[in-house]
Amino acid sequence: MNYGTNNHYANEYGMELNEYFKHHFNYEELAGWYTMQVLKYLVRAGKKEGESYDKDRNKALDYAGELANLSNENELTEYTTDDIMGFAQDIADDFKQWKDERNNFKSEFTKEEIKAIDERYLEFIEEV
C-alpha cells in the first residue's frame, strides 16, 4: 500500500486507517474488508472521473496482496495475489451483468456457472 504518500487516510498522529484495522479487527472482519476493497476497485476501474483504469486496478492489487499476506501469515491458505484477483474478477464480471431479477434480466452466465462462482466464493471464505 502507498503508506506515507497518501495521508488522506491518516489521523493527526500519522497512523493509517488500514493499520488501525489490523490492530482492532478480527481475522474474518479484516479478510472481509480486504475482499470488499478488491471488488470495489475492480468494479470501479476506469469509471471514476480523473482516475485511470490502471490506478484503480493497482489499488485492487494492493488490497489483494494484503489479503494474501493476511491469509498466509495466519497459515490458513496459500493464496497468491493472482489467485485472489482471479476470484474477485469473476465476481466483478458477474456483478457487471447483474440486474434486479424483477426486471427479467437474463445473465450471460449459465446457472451452472453462477453456482460454480458461488461455490468458489464459499470455499474461498472458508479458507481465508
UniProtKB/Swiss-Prot annotation:
Q: Which Pfam families match?
A: DUF3310
Q: Domain of life, per the record? A: Viruses
Q: Which UniProt keywords apply?
A: Early protein
Q: Which InterPro entries match?
A: SaV-like
Record function comment: Involved in the sensitivity of the virus to the host AbiV system.
Q: What family classification does the UniProt entry report for this protein?
A: Belongs to the skunalikevirus SaV protein family.
Name of the protein described by the UniProt record: SaV protein
